[in-house]
Amino acid sequence: MKILAKWLALAVLLCTTPTKAALDIVITEGIDAARPIAVMPFVWQGTGAPPQAIADVVMSDLVRSGTFKPLDELGLPQRNIGAVAQFQASAWGSVGAEALVLGSVKPYGTDQYLVSFDLIDLVKAQNQSLKGAVSPTEFLMDSRQTVISAAQFRQYGHRISDIVYEKLTGIRGAFLTRISYVVVNHTQKAPYQLMIADYDGFNEQMLLRSPEPLMSPTWSPDGRRLAYVSFENKKAEIFVQDLYTQVRTKVSSFPGINGAPAFSPDGKSLAVTLSKDGQPEIYVIDIATKAIKRITNHYAIDTEPSWYPDGKSLLFTSERGGKPQLYRVDLASGKVTRETFEGEWNLGGSITPDGRSMIFVNRTNGKFNIARMDLNTRFMQVLTSTRLDESPSVAPNGTMVIYGTTHQGKQVLAAVSTDGRFKARLPVGQGEVKSPSWSPFL
């Protein structure tokens, strides 16, 4: 509950557009292969209408995960049931879903609502029904209730989705997370906007607006700060901004390139690209003391650092082999190892949270696509089929990647599952959107 309280507090602090998504999500591939699940509308036990339909949030989350396909409510055998006590196992035998989510909402005081939900294993329930002995303790996978305010309905819907997803897959859900990105609208006097929003585009908040370019936002491991590059002072500078206090700290303002910041796993340092000593090289800056350490030293361009989960190595893009490829540098020894060989170029890489895979941009036959490589087998899989993909960022549970691409001549965000089955676009209403970054668990 402490984690949920922290997230809800941040959501209320930053919320500016709670009822409309700043980014639409258009699913383009993969829903047909998803696992069927039933999500019942939560029974409202008050007068008038509830503040928000929590079940709609849950259904949307499960669809966007690429893993589940909620069934049409009209085809469900029971209606208006809000608790496991009303569930009739025998009625659900021919539905074909593996699980059922149901719940209720009732007023619980001034701006307070008691939300209850149950997660039922329909396969176990049906097996018990056939045996003639139905016991909820055998098929009830989870049952919870929480008191929330009207402003917290959407966030608690994401929380329910996280629970359902983890119970059914064994993988932690990432619905209670946020994304950052840059919107560019050249019809405005200050066209560059640094934004954050819920992972699904709701609750968008503008952190900074500038007449000069903003780029490369990245989250701290605790989700409290954002580092980014700003040209607001007519040169590239790296800032770190606290999302709670809005305090901005300038971390790097050397002559030349100051770019591609990446927080260390402990949040104390930034890996960056600087050209202050000549060629672009990789450095690590202590955020508190501003102490700086040079990591690479080569005549070729070294850029786009990212951290391995253990904090002992960096992955980076380098042209030291003649064309952009991904390399690993051990921070203790300084030893550099080439990681990619397949395709013309490989760049913009990051390691998945479990340390087992690498996500990056692969160029083959002139097409830039998002790819995944298993670090054990070295097998590479191209995940996307578009042409100009860039800036991949991995969800904290490692199941999805958000990235920038071009659709109908316009820069948009898109998402793909790390197995390549599910794909979606996230177009913005006005302008173009790029440089996405997925937050850690919040």
UniProtKB/Swiss-Prot annotation:
Q: Which domain of life is it from?
A: Bacteria
Task: Point out the signal peptide segment.
Answer: 1-21
Q: Name one GO cellular component term.
A: periplasmic space
Q: Which InterPro entries does the UniProt record give?
A: 6-blade_b-propeller_TolB-like (IPR011042), PD40 (IPR011659), Tol-Pal_TolB (IPR014167), TolB_N (IPR007195)
Q: Does the keyword Nucleotide-binding apply?
A: no
State whether keyword Signal applies: yes
Q: Might you name a Gene Ontology BP term for this protein? A: protein import
Which Cys-Cys disulfides exist here?
none
Q: Which UniProt keywords apply?
A: Cell cycle, Cell division, Periplasm, Signal
Localization: Periplasm
Major place of residence: periplasm
Q: Which family does it belong to?
A: Belongs to the TolB family.
Question: How does the record describe its quaternary structure?
Answer: The Tol-Pal system is composed of five core proteins: the inner membrane proteins TolA, TolQ and TolR, the periplasmic protein TolB and the outer membrane protein Pal. They form a network linking the inner and outer membranes and the peptidoglycan layer.
Q: What does this protein do?
A: Part of the Tol-Pal system, which plays a role in outer membrane invagination during cell division and is important for maintaining outer membrane integrity.
Protein name per UniProt: Tol-Pal system protein TolB
Q: What is the species of this protein?
A: Shewanella sp. (strain W3-18-1)
